[in-house]
C-alpha cells in the first residue's frame, strides 16, 4: 500500500469519482491498543475520454492510529452508498468523511464538518491501493 501524504490529498481526490460510490467492506481492528480501519470502496476513476465511462475499480484505504470514528446507519439512507468522500488533514491527523455533503462554492471543509458526519474516521496515517480485479 502507498502512503498518502497531506500534500497529495487534492491530487488523489482528482484521480477518482467518489460520488455514488459504494462501501464494499469495512473492518475496524484494535491490536495492541492501536486502532486501524480498513475500507474497500467501489468507485469510478476520473474520466479521461469524454465518450467512454471507465469501469469501476476497487480502492482500499487503510487508516492507522485511529483516534476517533463514527459509523451510524440511518433508517432512511441506503446501506453502503456514499454521497461523496472528502479527505482532510487537521492537527496531524487524516480525516475521511464517507457521506460528505456539498459545501458552497469556495468553502473548504473544516474539522467540524468531518465530525458532524454519520460516517467518518480520523487517524495518524493513511494508505491506499487499487485492488486488482479477480480473473
Give the ranges of each region predicted by the language model.
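Surface-exposed, interaction-prone regions used to assemble/regulate multi-protein complexes
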Residues: 1-135
Amino acid at each position: 500500500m502507498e502512503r498518502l501524504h497531506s500534500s497529495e490529498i487534492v491530487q488523489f481526490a482528482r484521480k477518482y469519482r467518489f460520488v455514488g460510490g459504494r462501501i464494499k467492506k469495512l473492518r475496524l481492528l484494535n491490536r495492541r491498543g492501536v486502532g486501524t480501519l480498513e475500507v474497500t470502496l467501489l468507485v469510478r476513476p476520473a474520466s479521461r475520454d469524454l465518450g467512454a465511462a471507465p469501469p469501476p475499480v476497487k480502492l482500499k484505504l487503510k487508516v492507522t492510529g485511529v483516534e476517533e470514528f463514527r459509523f451510524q446507519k440511518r433508517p432512511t439512507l441506503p446501506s453502503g452508498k456514499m454521497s461523496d468522500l472528502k479527505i482532510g488533514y487537521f492537527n496531524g491527523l487524516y480525516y475521511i468523511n464517507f457521506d460528505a455533503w456539498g459545501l458552497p462554492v469556495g468553502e473548504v471543509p473544516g474539522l467540524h464538518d468531518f465530525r458532524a458526519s454519520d460516517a467518518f474516521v480520523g487517524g495518524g496515517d493513511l494508505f491506499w491501493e487499487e485492488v486488482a480485479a479477480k480473473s
